[in-house]
Amino acid sequence: MKFSTILTALTAVIATVAGYETSGKPHTVDILIDYSIKETPELSQNDVANWVNGDKYTLEYVVSNNEETEIAVVGVTGQFKNPVTNQIVTNLTTGQVGPITVAPGESIKFEQIVDVDLMANNYELFPYVFVAHDDLIKVIPCRGQLTSVVDATISFFDPRLILLELVLLVTFGAAAYFIYEIWGKQYLKGTAPVKVPARKSGSTVSKKGASATASGFDESWIPEAHLKKNKKKA
């Protein structure tokens, strides 16, 4: 098998696989491919893989060649589909593998890194493996894996959250300052109590004011004629 020919063909296939969907006349091959998730090896195809946005997950493939001639694993890709409508949501990045030669009756292993960057929702993952066999590049679909993608929780000490908190504090502080300068200061001036100076204790009465006589009462308001009568009697 000429690997230069295989690689040339693989390059052409990868260039047209961005919107990959199986088409054309199917070819029957006796090649078995299965995979597991490295981070959660206990999950089966009937389980749901819980993935977090922004994380990376590793798919560990096992390829068994039951053909009479050798094969070569040359690439891998995949799709996330809506599990209800079966519509394609996004394609995985197509990557080159090896080529890894697999003799008849033997098996090999290889890995694929999956970067999760999806809307939080439920999906079904369908990987596809490119295999060179009889000078042809054949695309072999793998089993589906249900996945539930959730957004990562943000820690209180996350630098992004701390930066957001600082921006909010500065914004509210500036707003409070301008409100005080425009309305608060004038309002406080208008409602402040006015201080009245207290009269000093022990102050003397003005000379122009009324004065008490020895009799103990103020005579300034008594008519003069009445005062004269009182003086005569005395």
From Swiss-Prot:
Q: Which residues lie on this side of the membrane: Cytoplasmic?
A: 183-234
Its main localization is: endoplasmic reticulum
Record flagged with keyword rRNA-binding: no
User: According to its record, how does it sit in the membrane?
Assistant: Single-pass type I membrane protein
Location in or out of the cell: Endoplasmic reticulum membrane
InterPro entries, A to Z: TRAP_alpha
* UniProt entry keywords in alphabetical sequence: Endoplasmic reticulum, Membrane, Signal, Transmembrane, Transmembrane helix
Topology feature Lumenal, residues: 20-161
Question: TM segments?
Answer: 162-182
Q: Where is the signal peptide?
A: 1-19
List the GO terms this entry assigns under cellular component, sorted alphabetically: endoplasmic reticulum membrane
Cited function: Is probably involved in a pathway contributing to genomic integrity.
Q: Which family does it belong to?
A: Belongs to the IRC22 family.
Q: What is this protein called?
A: Increased recombination centers protein 22-1
Source organism per UniProt: Candida tropicalis (strain ATCC MYA-3404 / T1) (Yeast)
The upper taxonomy is: Eukaryota, Fungi, Dikarya, Ascomycota, Saccharomycotina
